[in-house]
Amino acid sequence: MFHKLLNKSEILAYDKKYVNNYIINVENLSFFYSKEKVIDDISFQVKFGEIVTILGPNGGGKTTLIRILVGIYRNYIGVIKYAKNFIIGYLPQHFSVNSLIPMTVKYFLNSSYTKSKRKLKLSDVLKDINIEKILDRQMSEISHGELQLVLLARCLMLNPDIIILDEPVSCMDVNAKDSFYKLINKLISIYNLSVIMTSHDLHFVMSNSYRVICINRSIYCEGSPSEIVKNEKFLKMFSSYA
């Protein structure tokens, strides 16, 4: 196992900013739940500025892979190399808000990180994520789409190198999904970001990804959206989506 905490001062440092021109390099990664192998010898890289989407069926290992990359799961087999001084922003698939604890959106964002960890002030990110109108509302009262924007703003306050999102649009309608992906594309250029995300939505994946990695415990195809849609393994796996 080869992993470091996501604290900037503790990330594995390399002489070059990027690892052989990649911001993340995953080599021969496997992971077991008890005796069941749920990730099987996965290798891939993420370049600076890419949107990479992890696509696959339920139970195929997408969320497990994400949790390994962000440091939640550590007892894996394989090697993960990050670029020097690497910072990750993480938007989980499920984020619960306790309705019994009064907390405004503004308080939640300002109290999410210590001053030493927070690289940008809330005011710095509000100009790019339009959530000013909900800052004084209770966290328990905002919609799922609004919550995703709040969590995205929270990620940006770290001034990350990459944002990793697990099923970020799963509960959004078509218009909200479209707006969210447009925002992600805008943020990439503003903040010099790379993005890894998981998704089930083929339409939005194909129109908003630079590269797609299809996994079902192991990688069965990988490439640009135009390459993936011609892949026989992909067509067989996702024929029910057509």
From Swiss-Prot:
Keywords: ATP-binding, Cell inner membrane, Cell membrane, Ion transport, Membrane, Nucleotide-binding, Translocase, Transport, Zinc, Zinc transport. It is a peripheral membrane protein. It catalyses: Zn(2+)(out) + ATP(in) + H2O(in) = Zn(2+)(in) + ADP(in) + phosphate(in) + H(+)(in). Its EC number is 7.2.2.20. The keyword Ion transport applies. It is found in: Cell inner membrane. GO terms for molecular function: ABC-type zinc transporter activity; ATP binding; ATP hydrolysis activity. One of its GO terms (cellular component) is plasma membrane. Its main location: membrane. SMART domains: AAA (SM00382). ATP binds at residues 56-63. SUPFAM superfamilies: P-loop containing nucleoside triphosphate hydrolases. Residues 24-241 form the ABC transporter domain. Coiled coil: none annotated. InterPro entries: AAA+_ATPase, ABC_transporter-like_ATP-bd, ABC_transporter-like_CS, Metal_Ion_Import_ABC, P-loop_NTPase. Pfam families: ABC_tran. It is an enzyme of class 7 (translocase). Part of the ABC transporter complex ZnuABC involved in zinc import. Responsible for energy coupling to the transport system. The complex is composed of two ATP-binding proteins (ZnuC), two transmembrane proteins (ZnuB) and a solute-binding protein (ZnuA). Belongs to the ABC transporter superfamily. Zinc importer (TC 3.A.1.15.5) family. This is Zinc import ATP-binding protein ZnuC. It comes from Ehrlichia chaffeensis (strain ATCC CRL-10679 / Arkansas). The lineage of its organism: Bacteria, Pseudomonadati, Pseudomonadota, Alphaproteobacteria, Rickettsiales. The gene is znuC.
